[in-house]
UniProtKB/Swiss-Prot annotation:
Single GO cellular component term: extracellular region
A GO term, aspect molecular function: heparin binding
Signal sequence segment: 1-17
Domain called Antistasin-like: residue spans: 45-70, 100-125
Family to which the UniProt record says this protein belongs: Belongs to the protease inhibitor I15 (antistasin) family.
Species: Haementeria officinalis (Mexican leech)
Leftover remarks: Binds to heparin-agarose, binds to sulfated glycoconjugates. At least four isoforms of antistasin have been identified in leech salivary gland extracts, which differ by 1 or 2 amino-acid residues.
Function: This highly disulfide-bonded protein is a potent inhibitor of factor Xa. May have therapeutic utility as an anticoagulant. Also exhibits a strong metastatic activity.
Record protein name field: Antistasin
Keywords on record: Disulfide bond, Heparin-binding, Protease inhibitor, Pyrrolidone carboxylic acid, Repeat, Secreted, Serine protease inhibitor, Signal
InterPro entries: Antistasin-like (IPR004094), Hirudin/antistatin (IPR011061), Prot_inh_I15_antistasin_leech (IPR008086)
Amino acid sequence: MIKLAILLLFTVAIVRCQGPFGPGCEEAGCPEGSACNIITDRCTCSGVRCRMHCPHGFQRSRYGCEFCKCRLEPMKATCDISECPEGMMCSRLTNKCDCKIDINCRKTCPNGLKRDKLGCEYCECRPKRKLIPRLS
């Protein structure tokens, strides 16, 4: 019975996909309006289901996902790739420089991937964390 309950909780946690935005969404989940891409393990925006006609398009959440509310002004032009540091790309989703995703990395890392000085993940596993005992 306990094994069945654990399996059920594990399955629901993966399917629900609700929680903080960012890499590792299979474990952490995704914010409302987005879904977990199991190939890249990153949250992606769900399509907007809205019958409103908005001349300037829909507003976006802080994560860059559109929701059913009209923009009052036209959207700013996207950033230019030349504005982004090396190793980053211009995201049409957020209009900001964002980390490139290495879709060829097939490593399964229990402690996650290492990050470079810009905070972008690269295809190398983080070492196991050393636990330091607390002094009471």
